[in-house]
């Protein structure tokens, strides 16, 4: 089963990983890559660089900025493969420790 691990950052904190965090993230990535659990991972731009397109029905809207105004935002993600929730949750704990940020876990819909 696939899971999204969203890396949660705070606008008032450091968004980019420091040298030690990057080393820990690289080590975690190597571990899950070797185990065949890493599908992909990436850091993403801050919400001020987001653009929302809404062309549903008769709408014709392009808005700069994110859809949610919050101090918390997704700063990166992993997509991982795990046999069951307990394995994914254990990996999420490791990911959180590696990047020194909270991780929100969501399973993919089947």
Task: Mark where each language-model region is.
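Conserved, structured core segments of small domains
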Residues: 1-110
């Amino acid at each position: 089963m696939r899971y999204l691990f969203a890396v949660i950052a705070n606008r008032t904190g450091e968004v980019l990983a420091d040298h030690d965090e990057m080393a820990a993230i690289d080590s975690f990535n190597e571990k899950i890559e070797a185990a065949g659990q890493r599908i992909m991972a990436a850091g993403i731009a801050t919400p001020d660089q987001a653009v929302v397109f809404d062309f549903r029905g008769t709408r014709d809207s392009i808005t700069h900025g994110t859809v949610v105004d919050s101090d918390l935002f997704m700063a990166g993600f992993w997509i991982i493969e795990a046999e069951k929730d307990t394995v994914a949750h254990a990996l999420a704990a490791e990911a959180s420790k590696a990047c020194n940020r909270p991780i929100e876990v969501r399973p993919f819909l089947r």
